[in-house]
Structure formats: structure tokens, C-alpha cells
Amino acid sequence: MAVKWTGGHSSSILCLNANKDGLVASGGEGGDLVAWGEDGTPLGHMQLEGADDVTSVLFSASCPTKLYASHGETISVLDVRSLKGSLDHFHVNEEEINCLSLNETESLLASADDSGAIKILDLEKKKVTRSLKRHSNICSSVAFRPQRPQSLVSCGLDMQVMLWSLQKARPVWITNLQEDETEETEGPQTPGRLLNPALAHSVSVASCGNIFSCGAEDGKVRIFRVMGVKCERELGFKGHTLGVSQVCFLPESSLLLTGGNDGRIRLWDVSGKMEKLQKSPARHIHRKKAKRAACPTQGGNSRAPGAEDEGHAKILPKLDIEHGEKVNWLLSTKIKGNKSILVADQTSCVSVYPLNEL
């Protein structure tokens, strides 16, 4: 059962983040921003100027009281100890920002917006040093790669996933999830079965910096490995019966949290499955065969947690939570020293699930 944190918001919570001291920030509709203590007590509240939805919140790792929040086309810099006004603000995006990401050295802040652009803000110079424009639709998610402060991945509603190098200011690798999907689903289709387009909603990079995941509207979770300036898809499986709204690697781990519009939260160990595929001499043959395979057996049964991967083997979640609400944001952090999953959804509560057994 989840512990519910209440009393902070009056409408849907859209985003979450936590600092290393256990302080949690949540952003909601109408400009609402709340800071929470580890016991779930609201410590501070403010309404950001303009009353635009707060779409992303991000703590500084080097200065744990500093918080970046995106609302509308603006990024505000706040001190969570005193939520009375912003320390600084930047208006660098032309349309609503969807996601923020800091690089590991905290010299650069990326902001992805509805125009498909990603603005790279130099925090020392306080100016945009790069404007990355390649997505042809909303850029929904962006993430700097750990250990590689000049490299990032992004995804968007144009169904594209991109790897960027800031030295080049252009993507060094692009894949279209829908083309990928078309190849896989060649052959007989179930009559009357509609496939959701692979609109990409969320990306997350593992701590190693070389493995990243993407969640999409078709219910699939895809795992990629960066190989120099190219990426290879390592794994793809049907993780949810509706769109995957959130993917989130646990810190220093290959365990992946996913949340979906089906109201479920699942935890997957993707490393073991990738190792098996890599060791298999028939790996590429399996992939070709999988392209002719019918869709995973999970179908419309949300209680069948197994999902087929490209090699026809099933990948089973280590944890399967029937949360019951569409997931807006997922976060793995320590609360009072215990590993926990924090969930933002369509309600005004933050839900906290324990991860102690893992």
C-alpha cells in the first residue's frame, strides 16, 4: 500500500524531484510548487508567476537547496528553504517547456519544449550556447548522459529518439520508433486491432551513461546502448497495455521503473535480459524472426505482467503495482534512509511505495 502525501496541492501533480537530503519538490497545475519533508509534511508552497503549469522540477546536486522549475516558457531558480520568490529566471524557450536536465558538472541546463527545440543554457554565463532543433513535433523529454557532460538524448511526439553531441550541435544518431515498429509488425495482423503510434514520452539514462530507455504511446519500453556515435537497440518489450508515460532508471542500477496510462507501475531488471541476448549466437536471427512475430501476449489483460522481448523470451517485472491512476511522474529516491518510489498522478497527492526488498 502506498503512503499518501496530502495537503500540498489542490490539483494534479505533474512532476517530482528529490535532493540528497531527502527533501522533495513537486510541481503542479496552475503554477503550484510545493517542498515536502521526508515525513510527507508540506514545508513550503508558492505559486509561480503567470500561473502556468509547473512541468519539470530539478534540484542541484552540488547545492541541494537550489531548485530549477519550468513553467510555461520560463525557468525559475528557487531556494527551497524560502519559497517566497525566485533567485533568478530565464526566458529562453519560445514555447512551453516539458522537461529540464542538468549535466553532471552542472555547467549546462537543457530545456525541451513544445516547438521541438532543446535550449542549452550555460549557467555560468547565463545565456543560451546551443539551440538544438531537429524534432519536428513536441520534444517531450531530454536527459544528459552521466559521465558525459557534452552528450544528451531526447525523444518527442515525432516518434524520434536522438543522441546529441554538443560539439556538433546536431544529432549524431536518430531512430524513428514508428518505422522500427512497422518492420516488427509485418505479417498477419489481428483483425480490427489498432496500433497506437509510438509517440515517445520519456527517456532515462542509466548511471553508466551508455544505456538508456525510452517509453512510448504504443505501450513499449525500448532499451538502447550507445556505441560511440551510434546506438543499438538492445531490447524492446510491451511493458504496459496503454502508453508508457514515464521511464526511470534507479540510481547506480540497471533496474528500470516504468509507469503507464494503464495505471500500473513496474520495475524491470533489463541487464540480465540484455546479457542473454548478447551471449546468444543467434541474437540477430532472433531479432529478424521477432519482426515477424505477432504482438505480445499481454494484449488487453493488464494482469498478465509478462512481456515478450525481441528474442521471444518473456521478461517479467520484479515488481508490479496496480496504482490505479495515470502516472504523470516517477521518481526513485531514499526517504528516511529507505529506497522508495514516489509517484505523481492525476490526483493532488504524492504516493510513496517502499522498495526495501530490492
From Swiss-Prot:
PROSITE patterns: WD_REPEATS_1, WD_REPEATS_2, WD_REPEATS_REGION. Keywords: Repeat, WD repeat. WD repeats lie at residues 8-47, 92-131, 134-174, 195-234, 239-278. Residues 288-309 are annotated as: Disordered. Signal peptide: none annotated. Belongs to the WD repeat WDR53 family. This is WD repeat-containing protein 53. It comes from Mus musculus. The lineage of its organism: Eukaryota, Metazoa, Chordata, Craniata, Vertebrata. The gene is Wdr53.
